[in-house]
Amino acid sequence: MTSCAISGHRPTRFKFGYKETHTGCKRLKRVMREQFDLLYQQGVREFYVGGALGVDMWAAEILLRMKEQSAYSDLLLHMVLPFAGHDENWDERSRERLRFIMRHCADTVVIGIPGQLPLACYKLRNQYLVDHADCLLAVYDSDRSIRSGTGQTVHYAQRRGLHPIILVHPDTSDVCCLLK
């Protein structure tokens, strides 16, 4: 196992919304960091994130901070964007955060082509993440019956046989691992 895809909800899904100083957000980020460390100890060196607000951005920032430490210097972060300009309706601070991540990651892949429907691009982006990974870490509530890109990504990873599939609950930050 050498690579991990990351998926998760956008801030509007979380009880704390965009408030990253909220204890729930801090706890979630801490648990994500702990899981990345465990994956690294198991040989994972490449991480794939999708470039969305929320979990994707937080994961990328956590991983870049880890990479600054000599113990994680061989860590590689890959940014996979659904289409060029997917961030055009974001606030400037969020767009700058994305540009910073893109400048510091190993590479950026843009999935969609001009004229392609955005929804199709998001689905193809999620498939790309899974297709390039050995395991998946998803911030996802499997008990809620909401339709989401994260849910689709988890189910696609199950069909593809990724293992482990690590689920971090978006409200409690509890961690569970789906069995094959």
Feature-to-residue mapping (PLM):
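Acidic/glycine-enriched connector segments
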Residues: 1-179
